[in-house]
Amino acid sequence: MKAEGARRRDVTVADVAKAAQVSKAQAARALGNYGAVSEDVRERVLAAAEALAYRPNELARSMNTGKSHTIGVVVGDIENPHFGLATRGITDTAKKAGYNVILVNTDEDRAAEVDAVRVLLDKRVDGLIVAPASSVDTGHLQEVHRSGRPLVFIDRTAGDMPVETMAVDMARISREATQYLLDAGHRRIAFISTLTTDAPYTAGMALGSSQIADRIEGMREAYLDSGLDFPEDLVRLNAGDEDSIRSITREVLRGPDRATAVVASDGLIALSVVEAIQELGLSFPGDVSFLMYDDFAWTRLTSPPLTVIAQPVYNMGVAAAKALIRQMEGLPSAAPAQFTATLVRRGSVGPCPERSANEPELEAVDR
C-alpha cells in the first residue's frame, strides 16, 4: 500500500492516448494543436485529457517548439515597493501578450543573480529582464547577450553593455534635488544607501551599482556647481537592515557638525530613517530636512508629507516587457524609451536650522 500523501504520478501523453484509444503520436498532435488529426480523434483526446487532469510538460513543449512563452525577471529586492511596481508593469504587459513570468529575487547579491540567470535559462525562458546587482561584474549577463537570448535591463545599467535599458537619468535628478537642498541653506547633506561595500565611501571608489554611483555623482556635481566642498563623510553605505539604518541616522544627526538634511535612497530605508529621527526627538523640517527616492502612498500621509523623487517605475516595467517581447518576436526595435524622474516638493524640506551668519552664500560656478 502506498503511504498516505504519496506524490501522484504525473499524467503523460501516453496515458491520455491509452484512455482515448489512439496512438501516442495522434494524442500529441491533438494536445499540441499541430499536424493532421481527425475531429473525432481530437475530441476523444481532449475529453481523456480533461478526465485525467492532464497538464502539458512545458519544458518538453519548449524543446519541440523552441518557445516557452515565458519571461524570466530578476530583481534585487522584491520587498521594496519600487521593484513591486516595476514587476507589476512587466506582468501586466506580458499577460496581455500571452506570456507568463517567472520572478526571482536576488537580495542584491551577484552570486544569487548568477544562479538565478542560470536557473531561468535552464527553464528555457524566451527572454530575460534583469535589474543588475552589479554594474561591474557582468560576465554572466554578457554571456547571455552574446548567446543572442533576448535581454533587457531595468532600473540600472551593466557597464557599457549595448542592451536596451529602462531607467531614469539618476545623475540629473540627484543634482536637481541636491541643489534644492543647497538653495535652502543646507551644506551638510547625508545620503544613506543599502549598497554593500568593503570600506566606507571615498571619492573615486568603484561602486557596484550604476544607480547609486550616479546619485552620488549628481550630488557631487551640485556641490561643485555651487562652489562648495562635497561632504564625503556623510555618504553612508551598507545600510542593510533596520538596525544599521537607525544607527547610521543617529550618527549623522549628532554632534556639532551634524547633517541638517538626509536623503534616503529608497522607501524601505526611508521608513527606518523617519523612525530614527522621531526617536531622537527631532522633527522635519524644523530640525532636519528629509528627502527620499520614490513616491509611495504613505509618503503623503505623514505630517508633514514627505518630499520625494518620483520615478515612473510602473511605466518602466511596461516598457521593459514591450522591448523584450519585440526582441523575442523578431520585430523591429523602437526608439529608445525616455524616462524622467520628478522632484515632488512637499513639507519635509525647509531652511537649514543651523546656518551660521558668516557662512558663505552660494555662488554659481561655470563648468
Residue spans of the language-model regions?
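N-terminal helix-turn-helix DNA-binding module of bacterial transcription factors
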Residues: 1-69, 361-367
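Bacterial carbohydrate/catabolite-sensing allosteric modules
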Residues: 2-5, 51, 92-97, 145-153, ...
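Short hydrophobic/charged patches on amphipathic alpha-helices used for structural packing
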Residues: 60, 114-117, 141, 178, ...
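Active-site-adjacent beta->alpha loops and helix N-cap segments on the catalytic face
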Residues: 136-145
